[in-house]
Design a protein with these regions (language model features):
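Asparagine-centered strand-capping/turn motif at beta-strand->loop junctions
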Residues: 66, 207-212
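Surface beta-strand/loop "capping" patches
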Residues: 271-276, 281
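Short, hydrophobic/aromatic beta-strand segments
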Residues: 77-78, 214-221
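Generic detector of well-ordered alpha-helical packing
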Residues: 206-207, 224
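Aromatic side chains
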Residues: 187, 222, 273-275
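Short coil/turn motifs at secondary-structure junctions
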Residues: 210-213, 227-229
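Surface-exposed acidic/polar loop and edge beta-strand patches at domain peripheries
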Residues: 1-197, 201-203, 226-234, 239-263, ...
Length: 306
């Protein structure tokens, strides 16, 4: 079997940076399979996207874009004739340099929010508000927490692309993002995207390391966002929910129809619910968003123990 091929696209420790490149079967001497595949690294130019580094991965059936400048988020994708993602007013991807996370009372995160899958965290992941932490002198101090934390607005310091030939050749993209400050928590997020040639699936593996010398708080939320063709009036969330609880009084208004999505409404105020999902003995579980007719659906799988 042909040995795995690898390319380092970014390595700040060794001053390595590749602005653009394209990898195809022909360029690396591999046979074309599954309709052909490609991986392209580029840097966007113009508007709020200026300077954003992206990697476009096409496995011959599924294609998706990973944002190296935005916490290794998954921006958008296409599978067959289905688009994957949503149409955000932010119209990104937005370079974090244009995002002030503390503006509008900590809601600045929304200015760059338009990924299909974006990570929230790592020190905090929820709504903006005040928190009490130890300062550099060991005294309790009040600080402002912004919406959904910092990790989605931090660039990868190390990025590596791997092609693993085999019966089902794999494309693997690894990125390392650090959220760290002196006298503050220090996190290292290592993200790995893996997809096989010709498949309709991408696996995402995240490892978070505390590289400080003392324990720290840790939170992470996967903010997953889908529009048409999966989301339409009457679309349903299909999930093994043992218990569903409204997040607030607004969510409680429609708790009886928590799994059914309405048509777009001007001025709609979001409704969010908490779920306790049934899982297999090993902790694995899943959920699916399907359109009203049941002809299109997207499934997410994860492990409750992780």
């Amino acid at each position: 079997m042909t040995e795995a091929l690898s390319w380092v696209l970014t390595d700040t420790a060794n001053r390595v940076y590749v602005e653009q490149c394209a990898i195809t079967p022909a360029s690396v001497g591999l046979p074309t399979a599954g309709g052909g595949w490609s991986v392209t690294k580029s840097r966007l130019q113009g508007g709020l996207s200026d300077g954003v580094d992206v990697v476009d991965i096409n496995n011959g059936h599924l294609s998706f874009t990973v944002l190296l400048s935005r916490g290794m988020g998954l921006w958008k994708g296409v599978c067959g004739d289905c688009t994957i993602g949503w149409d955000s007013p932010a119209r990104g991807p937005v370079n974090p340099m244009f995002v002030n996370l503390l503006e509008q009372g900590g809601l600045g995160w929304l200015k760059g929010f338009d990924e299909c899958i974006v990570r929230c965290g790592l020190n905090s992941n929820g709504a903006p508000g005040m928190d009490r932490v130890l300062d550099n002198n060991g005294n309790l101090s009040e600080v402002m927490l912004n919406l959904h934390g910092y990790i989605a607005n931090l660039p990868a310091k190390y990025v590596e692309l791997k092609i693993i030939p085999g019966k089902r050749t794999k494309i693997v993209l690894v990125g390392v993002v650090e959220e760290a400050r002196c006298f503050c928590p220090q996190y290292r997020l290592t993200t790995t995207y893996t997809t096989e040639i010709g498949s309709s699936r991408v696996d995402i593996r995240d490892e978070v390391e505390n590289f400080a010398d003392s324990p720290v708080e840790f939170q992470m939320l996967y903010h997953c966002n889908f529009g048409p063709p999966f989301l339409d009036a009457g679309a349903r969330l299909v999930s093994p929910s043992l218990e569903v609880a409204p997040r607030d009084p607004r969510a409680a208004e429609d708790i009886k129809t928590w799994n059914v999505y309405k048509a777009p409404e001007p001025g709609y105020v979001e409704q969010g619910n908490y779920h306790d999902f049934a899982a297999a003995a090993d902790g694995s579980t899943l959920s699916m968003l399907r359109n009203r007719r049941g002809t299109r659906g997207v499934t997410m799988r994860w492990n409750k123990k992780q």
